[in-house]
């Protein structure tokens, strides 16, 4: 059963969502950036942010401890929204909760910069991290579009012959931009996302590239020899089957994957500061430490 707090938050989201759906891309970006700045204010005196001059990114570093681990964090936003402040928001939370250096990437967005811009930026960020940390000390974490991008990045890392990170953690990853497996019931249950809105964003991101291209929709890629994976998803979201199918395919290809499905939760519920979010963060901490701390 969902917590009282999550039920209240869900009600508020349901009331506000019709208005949010009316926002154009620019207003959506401004809203996400504002949320990121709010997270940063909450993290004051816990996390420091340092600009990275060579790539469009920032380091989020925990103030009260040293760390020899690194997280490459890829934010969500349907590939059309999110930005520097939004990335630093949840990236800062990861730095504080997982006690790690977090590289918060501000990757280029569609429609101004369609595929493969975001993937190219993710590759450069990972190469930058590899110059500072050994691969066994690096994890990739992504949510929503950033979760799908994280898996696309792994496929590209393998293609380039780079060392694989220690593990990957994703939250409600968008792994199939064709949206062929999103059911009508999934769309109705999700208070945050709509199938129509996602497909619109998918076409903006893909541009002239087919939606089932494995670097656009990693579910169609070669998922052999992937690092250990942890996936979080809610039962009440459009992308539920993306997570289930990705988990199943990882297992079929001989990889180790853990799938955590939270009842009555919606898209990227982990980011909402709920009791259910706390439980997910604790699972994330345990998984991250198992794979990066010697």
Regions of interest found by a model, annotated:
Residues 15, 52-58, 62-294:
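Alpha/beta-hydrolase superfamily serine-hydrolase fold, recognizing
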């Amino acid at each position: 059963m969902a917590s009282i707090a999550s039920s209240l938050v869900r009600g508020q989201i349901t009331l506000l969502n019709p208005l949010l759906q009316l926002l154009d891309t620019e207003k959506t970006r401004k809203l996400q950036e504002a949320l990121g700045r709010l997270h940063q204010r909450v993290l004051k005196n816990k996390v420091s942010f340092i600009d990275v001059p060579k790539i469009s990114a920032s380091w989020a570093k925990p103030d009260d401890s040293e760390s020899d681990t690194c997280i490459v964090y890829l934010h969500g936003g349907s590939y059309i929204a999110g930005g520097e402040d939004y990335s630093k928001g949840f990236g800062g939370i990861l730095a504080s909760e997982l006690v790690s250096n977090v590289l918060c990437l501000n990757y280029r967005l569609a429609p101004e910069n369609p595929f493969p811009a975001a993937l190219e930026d993710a590759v450069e960020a990972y190469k930058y991290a590899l110059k500072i940390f050994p691969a066994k000390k690096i994890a990739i974490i992504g949510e929503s579009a950033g979760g799908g991008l994280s898996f696309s990045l792994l496929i590209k890392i393998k293609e380039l012959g780079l060392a694989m990170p220690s593990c990957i953690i994703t939250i409600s990853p968008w792994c199939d931009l064709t949206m062929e497996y999103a059911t009508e019931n999934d769309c109705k249950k999700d208070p945050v996302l709509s199938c129509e809105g996602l497909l619109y964003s998918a076409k903006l991101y893909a541009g002239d590239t087919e939606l089932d291209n494995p670097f656009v929709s990693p579910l169609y890629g070669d998922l052999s020899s992937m690092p250990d994976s942890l996936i979080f998803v809610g039962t009440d979201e459009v992308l539920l089957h993306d997570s289930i199918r990705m988990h199943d395919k990882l297992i079929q290809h001989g990889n180790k994957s853990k799938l955590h499905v939270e009842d009555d939760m919606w898209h990227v519920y982990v980011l909402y500061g709920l009791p259910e979010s706390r439980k997910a963060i604790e699972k994330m901490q345990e998984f991250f430490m198992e794979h990066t701390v010697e």
